[in-house]
Each structure stands twice: as structure tokens, then as C-alpha cells.
Amino acid sequence: MTEHEDNRIRTYLAIGDSFSEGLMDESALEDGRFIGWTDRLAHALTQSPVGSPNLLYANHAIRGRQLTAIIDEQVPVALDLKPDLVSFVAGGNDVLRPSVDVDGLAEQLERAISAMRAEGIEVLLGNGFDTAAFSPMLRALRPRVAVYNAHMWTLAGRHGCYMLDLWGMRPLYAPEYWAPDRIHLSTQGHRMVAQSAQTVLEGSRVDFRGFRLQKTSKPLRDRMENEAEWLKDHLAPWVGRRLRGTSSGAFLDPKYAEWVPAAELPLDARSQSGRNVSPAAHQAAADDAAASEAPGTSEVPDAPEPPGTSGPSDRT
């Protein structure tokens, strides 16, 4: 990422929605807060050649926030603090809505990105998950997310941002990387995304291969029961909140509103030890799984695995 030590990342601010707040990392803190990939990335950067042992970290991401709210509430914080790095992953809650103007979202994003880049802030973007890995009910969102992602790549190239390609990280589609709601990452998923983000910032490239989703082996009856349970426990409450005009994060404050030393972040023991499983190892495992399937048999899985995400890609 940098050529000189003076350009190392010494301050990092995460903004966005539930993804960057850290839901549903099972390694929750005692006060109920989640750890998440941005906490893990901040800690990892204290031991990275592009980071600093004394790196300071703040997190203003709040669950349920749509893009307009993030731009109105969180981007001004970034412009005020002027951190070395901002991770800005947003728009997922907007794209889920039928009336969304995807081109309009891109225009909003560009204004926010331009403002931060004009202040010399490095920006790490993340694109949308492949919703074909969601429930069949949400598979129809895939074209909309794909258009949004195309805009994201354009913005990254246009403004010199780093891109965390969450769409293309096919190893992340495995069920163990997702929470039961099929929308948020598990602890393993957050670890993998943090590792990939670090790889991007360090200027390395990991060859995540493949395009198809892993074929499910569950019987049809089990898949139908799993779908019904998900609709009742997760989708119905979400729709109810939308109809009432409420948000799960309506009354929440930022997790880390002020700077905290990233080296002292409370992470679980496996995270403290560093990269326990490399992105390349994840890809190798995915290749082994794919080798057992005949070409062309891959299809959408039905386990708790939301839109897949993609691994690192170089800065554009």
C-alpha cells in the first residue's frame, strides 16, 4: 500500500451498517457488542507492514443504517477526524428494497467518496454479496446487486480506492461462515473477511477461483423445512420492522465512538494469534469440495449462507 513508513496506517475508522458493526460474530463482548471483521482488521494492522503498532481505531457503523443515513451521520465524522483509512461498506440495506434507485445510490456514494479522498483519506470499499446464495425468495435480487457492484468497481477505479470483493470470494459460501439468519457472517466469516481486507491493503493478491455456488446435498424436505424456519424466525421480523418504519439500530450508539488502541481490542484467543487460516487455505478447501462434483451440477445452497463474498483484489 505504501512506499514510506510515514504513510503507514496509524488511524482507522470503520463506517457502515451491521456488516461493519460486526453482526453476528459469536465472539460477542460482555456488554453485548459484537467484535466483527473491522475490529479484527484493526488489530491485525498493528502487526502489518502497512500498519502501526500504535494504530488507533474507531467504529461508527450501526446496524440497519441505509446509505443516506450513513452519509449524513458517519461520513461527516470521517471528514472531521481525517483518519488515514476509512472502510466504507454500505448500501446493502438499500438494495434489498424493491423501490431502490441503484444508479442514485452510486451517485450518493461518489459524492461521499470524493469528499473523503479530497481530504487525503484512503478508502476501502466493499461490494455486495451474491444473493443467489440466500433463500430462493431473495435470488431475484441478484441482478440488482450485480449492477450495484459494477458501479462500486467503477467508483473504486475512478477515485483510487481499495476494493474488498465480497461478491467473488467463493470459499466464503460454505455454511460455517454464516449466521443462521443467512445475512450476517459468523465468527469464522468475519475472520476470513478481515484476512482478505488485510491482504488487499498490503497490496497482495489471492487467487480466489470459481463462479458457481456449491451444490447442496440436503433432501428436498429438509430444504423446505429449513426455508420455512428461516422465513418465520428471520425474514418475517425484518419485514415487520420495515412496515413499522423501525430499525434494529434506531437507538444504538457507535461501538467505538472515540479512538481506542487497536492492539488492546478484546478479541478471542484464536484471533489474537493472527491469521489462523489463510485465504489461500480457504480456496484450497473450496477446490477440494468442488472436485467431488461433476461440472455443471453446482446450484444454490440452502444452508445458513447468505450472499457469498469475495476475496481480496488489488487497489484499482
List PLM regions with ranges.
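Conserved catalytic region of serine esterases and O-acyltransferases that act on ester linkages
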Residues: 6-8, 158, 181-184, 188-316
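Serine-esterase "nucleophile elbow" of acetyl-processing enzymes
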Residues: 1-63, 75-82, 280, 286-288, ...
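A short helix->loop->beta-strand "cap" motif at the edges of active sites that frequently abuts
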Residues: 118-123, 161
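Oxyanion-hole/transition-state-stabilizing segment in secreted/luminal serine hydrolases
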Residues: 21-25, 51-53, 67-104, 130-131
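Short hydrophobic segments within beta-strands
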Residues: 15-16, 126, 216
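Short glycine-enriched, charge-decorated loop/helix-capping segments at active-site entrances
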Residues: 26-32, 100-103, 138-142, 179-180
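Substrate-gating cap/lid alpha-helix
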Residues: 133-167, 187
